[in-house]
Amino acid sequence: MPYWRLSSFYFSYFALLGAIIPFWTLYLSDLGFDPLEIGALAAIMMGTKIVSPYLLGWLADKSRRPMRVIRWSAFLSFIFFLGIFLSSGFYYVAVIIASFTFFWNAIIGQFESVTLTQLGKHYSQYGKVRAWGSIGFIVAVLILGWLFNTIAIR
């Protein structure tokens, strides 16, 4: 994979995180969730980081097709994320968030492996490739922060 394909993945992945993470609790509060429920939903998001990278990493190793696992994880996380707009009940949102983040949190570890494999002996370029993720996060937070300050979140 060329430098820009790897870099664009990191930019996009972390831009999406920048669109979700800083504003997620505000969105949940706007939906009427109380602080305990918001904390529980945030814990679910973080809890899937403990399990999903290992399970889907195992699957990628067994299949020897890590990009297929990454693509399917991205697709399924997108489908589950769309479910957040269908209902606002706590248990429904908890299941949707658990499903979304199960697949989403598994992507980055697999892509790190793909990146290092693709860079091969040029592994010293990793920092430059990965920096695009930080740029994507910052750009998303700044643009959406301004946008949400101008218009309503919902």
Give the location of each predicted region.
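Paired intracellular helix-loop junctions of major facilitator superfamily
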Residues: T115-Y126
